Amino acid sequence: MQDKLFETSQKMPKFEFNQAVTDVFDDMINRCVPFYQHLLQQVAQLVGRNATVYDLGCSTGALVPFLKRRYSNFNYVGIDKSRSMIEKAQQHVGNNIQFLEGDLLDGVVFDQPTVIICNLVLQFIHPSQRKALIQTYMGALPKGGKLIIVEKVRQKNEALQQEYKKSYHELKRANGYSQAEIDHKDHALNGILVSETSEFYCDALGAAGASTIDTFFKWYNFEGMLGIK
């Protein structure tokens, strides 16, 4: 279903991952996140063979087909607090695939994970709580385990931040959104999606015990970061 949620000129409520968003989410994220399919392919490649993967904030489980195409043996647990997202994710069936409804702030019970993924999820959690979560997730991994974080980040330099925002809006217009839709969604996300700098995440990964930290994906204000314990 095509995303037309923000066409209305009426006052928009704050953004939430409800049924209306779930219904159009796959279209929305592919039009709003640059190179999203390629990004999922990169994440799947980083997972590696024989992995036990926890996908935190898994939404509709879009990573699963990429894992299936690449690996014959893996275990996957997807967790999301949106019931409608979890219900839609159930389409990705498999004996080694499990989806759970749960709030990351209530804690996650891990069972020997080798890879933990936070794909565009920490940005929806208050910045004051993110470092503690990263510490917890890194602590749950064995030596050599991977924490993969993908975020929409902000720049320290305000002029550069505005230049990147302009480029991002150009991308969304090229993908069929009107400027009015873009503005309406920005308003709905204000205070809901709060970006931090890439330095913030790299510092948090280092403090949590990552021995190797690298950026594997970057497009203006979107970054994929890898921490290896």
Predicted ranges, named:
Residues K11-M12, Q19-Q37:
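Class I SAM-dependent methyltransferase Rossmann-like catalytic core
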Residues P34-A51:
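Conserved alpha-helix/loop element of class I SAM-dependent methyltransferases that forms part
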Residues Y54, G61-D106:
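Class I SAM-dependent methyltransferase SAM/SAH-binding core
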Residues I117:
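A conserved beta-strand element that flanks and buttresses the S-adenosyl-L-methionine
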Residues K131-K143:
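A short glycine-rich, Lys/Arg-flanked "PGG" loop and its adjoining helix->strand segment in the class I
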Residues G144-K152:
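Conserved beta-strand signature within the Rossmann-like core of class I S-adenosyl-L-methionine
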Residues V153-G206:
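C-terminal alpha-helical "lid/dimerization" subdomain adjacent to the S-adenosyl-L-methionine
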Residues D214-K229:
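Core SAM-dependent methyltransferase catalytic element
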